[in-house]
Amino acid sequence: MKIYRVLVHLSFVLGMFTKTNTVLAWSKYDLVHGFMRVANISSIMRLDCLPNLLSSNAGYAALPSDDIPTGIFIKVNCSIPEFILWYEQKAMAAWINPIMGTVLMMNDVLKSGLENSVKVGLLTFLKRIAEKGPNGPLRNRGSGCINLIAPADISCYGSTRLDRFNRDFEDDSRGMPCRAKAMRRTTSGSRRANA
């Protein structure tokens, strides 16, 4: 009976991969959608949900830090659940890919030493979250840009614009890490700041 339950859970996890069609082709590092400065847990939970269009069309990138998060939060009241990593010492939160977040948490539950009844309950909860998630693939945005050592560094997008991850087209197309602002000439000959 125990082996049967494990096989059922494994088939569900594998079903998550086939449901999204492209998860198996993703890099395991492509997790982060965006960062935001937050003072505490209640600040995270009081934020409005991301708009559906932004959530379902979001790009995801690698975590720019090896820091271990202080907490993991799942906002299930949103139409597309939001997985949030909170870094207490840096007062930062990262919104991660909900498909990958669900799959990775399921994997951790399966590998844990928890009692079977607890595992079944957690996996049922995660399955419900997965069913609310986007059905299509989520695109990879490339490397993120945030200076976690100096989050007040205004040269990094995501730390100066706290408007829930709006990025310029140039930020995504270059795929470059944080860079200092520098003046550059436009085609009209005027100068403008380059973030």
From Swiss-Prot:
InterPro entries: Herpes_gL_C, Herpes_gL_N, Herpes_gL_N_sf, HSV_GL_alphagamma. The keyword Disulfide bond applies. Keywords: Disulfide bond, Fusion of virus membrane with host cell membrane, Fusion of virus membrane with host membrane, Glycoprotein, Host cell membrane, Host Golgi apparatus, Host membrane, Membrane, Signal, Viral envelope protein, Viral penetration into host cytoplasm, Virion, Virus entry into host cell. The keyword Glycoprotein applies. Residues 1-25 form the signal peptide. One of its GO terms (biological process) is fusion of virus membrane with host plasma membrane. Disulfide bonds join C49-C78, C156-C178. Residues 28-157 are annotated as: Interaction with gH. It comes from the Viruses. One of its GO terms (cellular component) is virion membrane. PROSITE patterns: GL_AHV. It is found in: Virion membrane; Host cell membrane; Host Golgi apparatus, Host trans-Golgi network. Residues 28-195 form the gL alphaherpesvirus-type domain. It is a peripheral membrane protein. The heterodimer glycoprotein H-glycoprotein L is required for the fusion of viral and plasma membranes leading to virus entry into the host cell. Acts as a functional inhibitor of gH and maintains gH in an inhibited form. Upon binding to host integrins, gL dissociates from gH leading to activation of the viral fusion glycoproteins gB and gH. Belongs to the herpesviridae glycoprotein L (gL) family. Alphaherpesvirinae gL subfamily. Interacts with glycoprotein H (gH); this interaction is necessary for the correct processing and cell surface expression of gH. The heterodimer gH/gL seems to interact with gB trimers during fusion. This is Envelope glycoprotein L. It comes from Gallid herpesvirus 2 (strain Chicken/Md5/ATCC VR-987). The lineage of its organism: Viruses, Duplodnaviria, Heunggongvirae, Peploviricota, Herviviricetes. The gene is gL.
